[in-house]
Amino acid sequence: MEGARPVRAPRGTTLTARSWATEAPLRMLMNNLDPENAERPDDLVVYGGTGRAARNWASFDAMVRTLTTLREDETMLVQSGKPVGVFQTHEWAPRVLIANSNLVGDWATWPEFRRLEAMGLTMYGQMTAGSWIYIGTQGIVQGTYETFAAAAEKRFGGTLAGTLTLTGGCGGMGGAQPLAVTLNGGACLIVDVDEARLRRRVEHRYLDEVADNLDDAVTKAVATRKDKRAWSVGVVGNAAEVFPELLRRGVPIDLVTDQTSAHDPLSYLPIGISVEDWEDYATKKPDEFTERAEESMAVQVRAMVEFQDAGAEVFDYGNSIRDEARKAGYDRAFEFPGFVPAYIRPQFCEGRGPFRWVALSGDPKDIHATDEAIMKLFPDDDRLQKWMRGAREKISFQGLPARICWLGYGERDKAGVLFNDLVASGKVSAPIVIGRDHLDSGSVASPYRETEAMLDGSDAIADWPLLNALTATSSGATWVSIHHGGGVGIGRSIHAGQVGVADGTELAAQKLSRLLTNDPGMGVIRHVDAGYERAEEIAAERGVRIPMREGE
């Protein structure tokens, strides 16, 4: 086959590959490009500006062809979205090993990356686009929910009721924000330059409505805040223009953040450029476009800082907008914190982070069965119980039915083995894929996001995600990935991911138990090594071996 075409993962229990160990990555690769999931499927772009599932359509076809014939003792190697080899390994080895977007340090810049990309030598994999475990906007909703819940506890008495959150960016990642705010009881006003994105989030029930204009949006959002009602309003506009205007008007904003695609300046629309002219301008004059984008980001960040000066809770949501504003000469850009040091790091110290699963059958009933099972498994986790109830009521599936929640060390392995038992007993009709975002407690080096302001100054130490990937590879993962630049952009992060498959066999149970113990265990030891007392307590309580402590 040649060129773009609609892609949808097979459903049901009939294999198109030799085993579920290869059927799973095959279906998940295709699921990433399902039109319900992908932002621009014809271009192989899944989310996050230019995050791709495959380098080109020829590479996609070659990966599909290889996965359908791959044996249970073979491993396919993928170099930036292109299959480059198959080797004989063993049944405990991953069926797929993936490396995306990785560049040597001095060459790790956007201009150099784009030059190499234009030559057909690499692609941008984001985090879950090139690692084939994207589940639509739901994939980020849980983490976003956790973040806003933590902000509510820190600043607003445990709820966002009676508050108004202002944010920008309603794409595949940012589109999670309005639902996360309303699940925490608050009102949300979200700005995006693309009306189609806003309409899509309404269709998928992540956003409640799109206002006619800014005046209409402000009126509705402020009224909702006053009534202490959970409701979200989208408005078409450029955040770099809307944020300062709302500040000028004195709109009562309680919380401010942003999830525009600021990590890649070519994916951030500067002031004064129309959506229609965007792609052509960025392609023909990338340097000039980048400079204008950074100047606009500085305007937006200035407004965010001034909202903070006025008393609002403000945080960076991990898209590098502060650093881009700094590049443009704004010297107060880092006066508000990133979301991880502000709210999430205590959970990382417990090895707690994203745990997602997908029903390969395509049957929503299988996810409903797992929902019931996981709520029974952790009956005393109030935050999880609240999340699961909200997710079941509010979240629409995109592509294959999926679910996500946050679990910690000593919990993920129990859930994985339980899901495998459900498959073995026939309570779910086909195997379950179990993975996570690369944003996790021990799988990322990202000084502007996950590892910002580490206690020991180890923000930029990138050994940890590499050790994480090596650990997953040797612990029974079905596919493992190492990426560069996800979330915050080229030159700013190294991160790893793993995916396992619950197919109901005893071998799968052994693999999942080991994999889902060791993977969050990396988060515990990473934070022990950095000197976090809570991580030290967790390691002692749960028997995580720390060699440097064993001689004490």
Swiss-Prot record:
Keywords: Cytoplasm, Histidine metabolism, Lyase, NAD. Its EC number is 4.2.1.49. One of its GO terms (cellular component) is cytoplasm. Pathway: Amino-acid degradation; L-histidine degradation into L-glutamate; N-formimidoyl-L-glutamate from L-histidine: step 2/3. PROSITE patterns: UROCANASE (PS01233). It catalyses: 4-imidazolone-5-propanoate = trans-urocanate + H2O. GO terms for molecular function: urocanate hydratase activity. The active site is at residue 405. SUPFAM superfamilies: Urocanase (SSF111326). Catalyzes the conversion of urocanate to 4-imidazolone-5-propionate. This is Urocanate hydratase. It comes from Mycolicibacterium smegmatis (strain ATCC 700084 / mc(2)155).
